[in-house]
From Swiss-Prot:
Residues 2-122 form the MTTase N-terminal domain. The keyword S-adenosyl-L-methionine applies. [4Fe-4S] cluster 2 binds at residues 157, 161, 164. GO terms for cellular component: cytosol. Keywords: 4Fe-4S, Cytoplasm, Iron, Iron-sulfur, Metal-binding, S-adenosyl-L-methionine, Transferase, tRNA processing. It comes from Methylorubrum extorquens (strain CM4 / NCIMB 13688) (Methylobacterium extorquens). It catalyses: N(6)-dimethylallyladenosine(37) in tRNA + (sulfur carrier)-SH + AH2 + 2 S-adenosyl-L-methionine = 2-methylsulfanyl-N(6)-dimethylallyladenosine(37) in tRNA + (sulfur carrier)-H + 5'-deoxyadenosine + L-methionine + A + S-adenosyl-L-homocysteine + 2 H(+). Residues 378-440 form the TRAM domain. This is tRNA-2-methylthio-N(6)-dimethylallyladenosine synthase. The gene is miaB.
Length: 446
């Protein structure tokens, strides 16, 4: 049987897309492999959000060129595919920089992958069009991959933040219909998935057709999903502060499947920098939004994204970011040094922050965020929480799962608990996960 190796870089949507590409190849007779050396088709599903991520792809392609040559010497064919956002952004340039690549395919065209592979036997192929047809209508049924799963409900972004390539690589905001999302969710649950994370570049801008043909909100979509038998938990990511509707806030209080966790990027605490980033909100507007969300769900865990060293950022601007972090308190966060991306407005600016200053600011921010994360996890010790068991743990007799607040937890229980919710008393907080004990009889009953 032919074998396919699919590697994904970057965001959760890339992980979803990588899985769907594996499904497309499986329908063509390819079995999945984790060993690139034995693959007949190698797919790199790429991320273009930062320069470092893009350069990783070219480094990997250099290694794959050698592998392709070695396999050819033994009479084995290898097709190399570059997919995702680097493919969309750089197109034919990839063929120039990486001679071993056979197919370049953008994120809106990967349902065509089998045809592109066939075409590549005659000539190298680039497909970075935004086709009129909905790719989701052309994808095969999803295969079961575990207890949790991603489900794309929205793609693209209309916000045009000054630092971001997503509007150029993923296109304008489009949403799938409620019926299509519910049907895919139903199939996932039938395959064993118990927790679904709804994903989109700007997921709370969701506006897919509802049952009556009118645009539905993300809150309404989650209400519809809560009726899927066997579905236990719902999450969503990534959101924009400007698209947080009242009914989405209310869903955190009224829909029992919506978990008390929210990833809501803010990027900076400085109003001056937020304006330069074209974020269209202020630091205080973000604070007020968080206050409203916490009023609806007081125990909600918050995470965010931050960029340090955006062009023109001063010490005073950075101090405002630290103040916002201190004011709000996060359970987790992702923080990065600004990386210019060709074609974005910020890349044209001439007031770059020195690399050494970026490094210093990132270290200070991450120190504060790490202290908040450790304090948040330490506060969980002694509490009783419900763990959705996802897999076996690191040690024999151990399983691992997540709290409603998306904290990783390990505890002793049989593998038969995988896919069930087990009440667990948290006994210890480690550096990256929590440890606990299942309530007596709970694990056995599961």
């Amino acid at each position: 049987m032919k074998k396919a190796y699919v590697k994904s870089y970057g965001c959760q949507m890339n992980a979803y897309d990588a899985g769907r590409m594996a499904d497309v190849l499986a329908a063509e007779g390819y079995s999945a492999t984790d060993t690139v050396e034995e693959a007949d088709v190698v797919v790199l599903n790429t991320c273009h959000i930062r320069e470092k991520a893009a350069e990783k792809v070219y480094s990997e392609l250099g290694r794959l060129r050698v592998l392709k040559g070695d396999r050819a010497e033994s009479g084995q064919e290898t097709r190399i595919v570059v997919a995702g956002c680097v493919a969309q952004a750089e197109g034919r340039e990839i063929l120039s920089r990486a001679p071993a690549v056979d197919v370049v395919v953008g994120p809106q065209s990967y349902h065509r992958l089998p045809d592109l592979l066939r075409q590549s036997r005659e000539t190298r192929v680039v497909d970075t069009e935004f086709p009129a047809e909905d790719k989701f209508d052309h994808l095969p049924a999803r295969r079961n991959r575990g207890v949790t799963g991603f489900l794309t409900v929205q793609e693209g972004c209309d916000k045009f933040c000054a630092f971001c390539v997503v509007p150029y690589t993923r296109g304008a905001e489009v949403s799938r219909s409620v019926a299509a999302v519910v049907e895919e969710a139903r199939r996932l649950v039938e395959g064993g998935v118990r927790e679904i994370t709804l994903i989109g570049q700007n997921v709370n801008a969701y506006h897919g057709d509802g049952p009556d043909g009118a645009p539905a909100t993300l809150g309404q979509l989650m209400d519809a999903l809560s009726a899927v038998p066997g579905l236990l938990r719902l999450r969503y990511t990534t959101s924009h502060p400007n698209d947080f509707a009242d009914d989405l806030i209310a869903a955190h209080a009224t829909n029992p499947l919506v978990m008390p966790y929210l990833h809501l990027p803010v990027q900076s605490g400085s109003d001056r920098i937020l304006h330069a980033m074209n974020r269209r909100h202020t630091g205080d507007a973000y604070r007020r939004l968080i206050e409203r969300i916490r009023n609806a769900r007081p125990d909600i865990a918050l995470s965010s994204d931050f960029i340090v060293g955006f062009p023109g950022e001063t010490d005073a601007d950075f101090a405002e970011t630290l103040r916002l972090v201190s004011d709000i308190g996060f359970s987790a966060a992702f923080s990065f040094k600004y990386s210019p991306r060709a074609g974005t407005p910020a890349a044209e600016r001439e007031d770059a922050v020195p690399e050494a200053v970026k490094t210093e600011r990132l270290a200070a921010l991450q120190d504060l965020l790490d202290r908040q994360r450790h304090a948040y996890n330490a506060a969980s010790v002694g509490t009783l929480t419900e763990i959705l068991v996802e897999k076996t743990g690191r040690h024999p007799g151990q399983v691992a799962g997540k709290t409603p607040h998306l904290q990783a937890v390990q505890f002793d229980a049989p593998a038969s608990t995988i896919g069930t919710v087990v009440p667990v008393r948290i006994t210890r907080a480690g550096s990256n996960s929590l440890f606990g004990e299942a309530l007596e009889g709970a694990a056995a009953a599961a």
